């Protein structure tokens, strides 16, 4: 499985955890991530670990390229949850995120469930 991690800062702990689930490529720019998808094909999941407008910019870049790639946005600002829906993020998590939450959500995205529960509503973890 190929996972894209989009963040301006190094996320060693999260990267190590995601590496247990698949091959991880880290990008500090949404444009570079979309370029990699154009060149090598879409990722199995994209994880955006940026707060506020930066996270929104990453999501806009990803969704501008693909409406289908599973997208998880993690932010420390819960008030951006409505924007995550507008950006069509499959799941929005509020920091701090436990290792269990990250593993479960990414695993679900990789399995193609894309963050939806039985009723088809988006799941939000806080």
Sequence positions of predicted segments:
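The C-terminal output helix
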Residues: 107-122
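Alpha4-beta5-alpha5 "output face"
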Residues: 63, 82-86
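C-terminal output helix
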Residues: 97-106
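Two-component/phosphorelay signaling modules centered on CheY-like receiver
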Residues: 2-35
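Conserved phosphotransfer microenvironments
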Residues: 14-15, 33, 39-66, 77-78
């Amino acid at each position: 499985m190929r996972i894209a991690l989009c963040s301006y800062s190094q996320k060693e702990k999260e990267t190590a955890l995601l590496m247990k689930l698949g091959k991880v490529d880290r990008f500090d720019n949404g444009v570079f991530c979309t370029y990699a998808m154009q060149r090598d094909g879409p990722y199995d999941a994209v994880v955006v670990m940026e707060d506020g407008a930066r996270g929104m910019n990453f999501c806009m870049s990803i969704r501008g390229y693909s409406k289908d790639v599973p997208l998880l946005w993690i932010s420390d600002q819960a008030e951006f949850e409505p924007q995550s829906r507008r950006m069509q993020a499959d799941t929005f998590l509020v920091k701090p995120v436990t290792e269990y939450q990250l593993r479960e959500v990414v695993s679900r995205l990789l399995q193609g469930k894309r963050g939806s529960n039985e009723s088809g509503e988006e799941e939000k973890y806080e």
